[in-house]
């Protein structure tokens, strides 16, 4: 009986089906009523909604104005999800979740291809899934998981292209898609590939026709958005996109202050990549050793995949750990292979049921319990999407923006825009300026923190009319506009509230 169970758990087909099905349940489970966060999920979801409703797929819009900080591919994919599921928080995270599942599968498949060992492949997928950073981000509507998938797919095409040159085409297309996902960060497969090909086979490999064709495809696909927007907007696009703070690896303040910031990503990994961090460090060292001493192709491949993005990204002062998700599949494979070398076969057989059990337990926690242990399991933007957004939608005309009083430019701007279908206008910080604006334009509506509204009521009695308030926000207008306030929703199609 035990032998049959162990044989089933070690079967490649069973492992693949289990990983794909479990990942789908983990990443898409309990998503219908969670909502999306203001940062950065609603920001990207709003962009996807606007490009979905616009006439041009190549121009990314925000507040109906061209914006150049992000390429359009993730928004195209989210737009397709909107087409299928309707505009909702679920559709906003759908493509990211699917790419999370595909990255899990690709990690398993690539590791199996490299080492021909189902245990190492399954454990690599397990390491990628846990701890929860990758899991949590796969349940959110950001760009990093999508980038991780395209980079992983590109690296898969690169290593398989050594034996079958047709895979260099996959390498090129996936690299191009990575660029269309997150701009210059998507070029890392080319940088890694050039170093790897030269290290592995010198100029002969580097100038292989199939490989150069793959790079050409990558540049053609990846640079298409640059070319289209440069053609439409000229130098304004170039300056706006490439001078953005997020695009600069080496900042103007590079030499100012302590250079200890170069260790920022290492510190973040040390805090968050447990329990695998010590093994990942030792494993990376061992892979580097085999790369330089033994010229082992697979060790070179994974070592460069991890080290090149890590070292280059560490030079940036804009360090966020999720930007490194593109190296997490390689780290998972290094960690898995290293631990496998330390264990006997009997120990591996004993650990396999535990890994399956942990994955099943996670599926149950996500889908059948109310546990809120990660951002993506919390109720996000609840104060906006469940009630305020509906009142803003019906009481703010489509061409009129809702204004903020003592709220920041960023919060809750994007969640409010996504859930109410209304844009955000001016921000006023002083009460006298607010009263002056209300006197001039009494039909305008305003949003503020509820405690700020209580102070306004106290200091200016009879001047303001509260349309609706919850525990966090108050939505109000002038007393002169009271009769125009709408509370009847019976004949109104409300925007998304989930």
Q: Which positions does each model-derived feature cover?
A:
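Transmembrane-helix signature of polytopic, membrane-embedded enzymes
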Residues: 14-20, 107-130
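Short periplasmic/luminal acceptor-recognition loop of GT-C membrane glycosyltransferases, typified by
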Residues: 24, 366-483, 495-496
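Extracytosolic helix-loop segments that constitute the early lumenal/periplasmic catalytic or substrate-binding loops
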Residues: 24-28, 43-66, 73-76, 80, ...
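Short acidic/glycine- and proline-prone juxtamembrane loop motifs at membrane-interface regions
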Residues: 93, 136-146
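Transmembrane-helix motifs of polytopic, lipid-linked glycan transferases
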Residues: 94-115, 153
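Membrane-interface transmembrane helices that cradle and orient dolichyl/undecaprenyl
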Residues: 112-114, 118, 154-170, 339
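Transmembrane-lumen/periplasm boundary regions of multi-pass, lipid-linked membrane glycan transferases
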Residues: 177, 186-298, 305-317
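Hydrophobic/aromatic-rich transmembrane helices and adjacent perimembrane loops
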Residues: 317-344
